[in-house]
Amino acid sequence: MYRTAKTTLIGEAIVRLSKSGDFELTVSKGPGITLLSLRQDVEFAEFNANFTGQRWSGPLTEAPPQLRGWLGLRDQFLRAPNRKTLRYVSGSEMFFFHF
């Protein structure tokens, strides 16, 4: 779940982490309906939010401020890759994952 004062997003999440630290997050509402996808490594990210039409890709150092919370998820998952529950707050954004 993703929540701000004005937005709530609930869906099924698939998280992939590679041994080299590559991160992939896909949030969907059932088969074939992808709401959001994020691919990220140490230096680069690609973000597609189909539910808002927001898209961005490039070096992390050039990321728009509104993506900072999403781009912080990689580090959260890398700290405890086998965690069943993850709660992460970044500014006014709250992320909650339960696997």
Residue locations for each model-derived region?
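An acidic-aromatic
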Residues: 22-72
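C-terminal low-complexity, charged extensions that often adopt amphipathic alpha-helices
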Residues: 54-99
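Post-signal-peptide N-terminal segment of Sec-exported extracytoplasmic proteins
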Residues: 1-35
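Ser/Thr- (and often Asn-) enriched beta-sheet segments in non-cytosolic proteins
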Residues: 8, 14-16, 37, 46, ...
